[in-house]
From Swiss-Prot:
HAMAP family: UPF0145. It comes from Sulfurisphaera tokodaii (strain DSM 16993 / JCM 10545 / NBRC 100140 / 7) (Sulfolobus tokodaii). This is UPF0145 protein STK_10800. Belongs to the UPF0145 family. InterPro entries: UPF0145_dom_sf (IPR035439), UPF0145_YbjQ-like (IPR002765).
Length: 114
């Protein structure tokens, strides 16, 4: 991922221990759409016959989530936020072989608690 951990705080919780929310900037969303290629589908189909983890899809899903998260973070930074709380992921199949992955949360400005 291209952002540094220190750039912005990210949490699935509704608050950040040790920090006070001083401003809510709003909902931020990052979206990516990925296509499952023919080669990956063939390999995955074969692997599903014999059982086990389908590594081609796991890798694609991990990359897609990271890209959606990165896009969400960039939108939060553009709003002037230094944290995103209540982060969630969602995914939908848009068409055969195409998946939409969404990362969303609430962009906020936080300060260290005393």
């Amino acid at each position: 991922m291209s952002f540094r951990e220190s750039d912005i705080l990210i949490t699935t919780a509704q608050e950040l221990p040790g920090y006070k929310i001083v401003e809510v900037k709003g909902v931020v969303i990052g979206i990516t759409v990925r296509s499952r290629g023919l080669g990956g589908n063939i390999a995955a189909s074969f692997r599903s016959l014999i059982g086990g983890e389908i590594k081609e899809y796991v890798e694609m899903a991990e990359q897609a989530r990271m890209q959606a998260l990165e896009r969400m973070i960039e939108r939060a930074k553009a709003l002037g936020a230094n944290a995103v709380i209540s982060v969630r992921f969602d995914s939908n199949e848009l068409a055969q072989n195409m998946d939409e992955i969404i990362a969303y949360g609430t962009a906020v400005v936080v300060t260290k608690s005393i």
